[in-house]
């Protein structure tokens, strides 16, 4: 116990002078201070924005590794020593749970970001289809429309959005929607692409609409 000025009631007590006896308390105090700072910075129900500092986590682990259940070295573990060992185990468990929680909330936060991006890209699909048709008719060779198309493609590329569905590409029912199968052999490829597909990273936003054909003979 400490007085209001931060000094222990009995500075000479082994509990306050023995490094082994105080290491667990120091570790627990460090963990509590980290948790208090995190609670102030992150409102309830929101994902954590910052991780516990590597220096603090290393300090906690170092302090915990120095704890010996037999503090007085008499070969027997007293009730106080048993309680200290239990508190140390509890702190180790809480530290591991906090690390797992931090990783889980980070995954959830990234999932929310990806969902929002996918929603925006979905709303832009009609515009992308119009630009694709304009390119097929030769309207994107030059002029302001080409400049607009290039800028939009660059922005989407920065968001890891890419199109797929090219003639001759192997048919994949997971990402290609076949309107008609005109192939006669076992090997099926895209004979005609009616509408391009788009993906955001590993997430398919829209499948490609295609006609299946046979591969061209080389």
Swiss-Prot record:
<keyword id="KW-0963">Cytoplasm</keyword>
<comment type="function">
    <text>Participates actively in the response to hyperosmotic and heat shock by preventing the aggregation of stress-denatured proteins, in association with DnaK and GrpE. It is the nucleotide exchange factor for DnaK and may function as a thermosensor. Unfolded proteins bind initially to DnaJ; upon interaction with the DnaJ-bound protein, DnaK hydrolyzes its bound ATP, resulting in the formation of a stable complex. GrpE releases ADP from DnaK; ATP binding to DnaK triggers the release of the substrate protein, thus completing the reaction cycle.</text>
</comment>
<dbReference type="GO" id="GO:0000774">
    <property type="term" value="F:adenyl-nucleotide exchange factor activity"/>
</dbReference>
<comment type="similarity">
    <text>Belongs to the GrpE family.</text>
</comment>
<protein>
    <recommendedName>
        <fullName>Protein GrpE</fullName>
    </recommendedName>
</protein>
<dbReference type="InterPro" id="IPR009012">
    <property type="entry name" value="GrpE_head"/>
</dbReference>
<keyword id="KW-0346">Stress response</keyword>
<feature type="region of interest" description="Disordered">
    <location>
        <begin position="1"/>
        <end position="75"/>
    </location>
</feature>
<feature type="compositionally biased region" description="Basic and acidic residues">
    <location>
        <begin position="23"/>
        <end position="40"/>
    </location>
</feature>
<dbReference type="Pfam" id="PF01025">
    <property type="entry name" value="GrpE"/>
</dbReference>
<dbReference type="InterPro" id="IPR013805">
    <property type="entry name" value="GrpE_coiled_coil"/>
</dbReference>
<dbReference type="GO" id="GO:0051087">
    <property type="term" value="F:protein-folding chaperone binding"/>
</dbReference>
<feature type="compositionally biased region" description="Acidic residues">
    <location>
        <begin position="48"/>
        <end position="75"/>
    </location>
</feature>
<dbReference type="GO" id="GO:0006457">
    <property type="term" value="P:protein folding"/>
</dbReference>
<keyword id="KW-0143">Chaperone</keyword>
<dbReference type="GO" id="GO:0042803">
    <property type="term" value="F:protein homodimerization activity"/>
</dbReference>
<comment type="subunit">
    <text>Homodimer.</text>
</comment>
<dbReference type="InterPro" id="IPR000740">
    <property type="entry name" value="GrpE"/>
</dbReference>
<dbReference type="GO" id="GO:0051082">
    <property type="term" value="F:unfolded protein binding"/>
</dbReference>
<dbReference type="GO" id="GO:0005737">
    <property type="term" value="C:cytoplasm"/>
</dbReference>
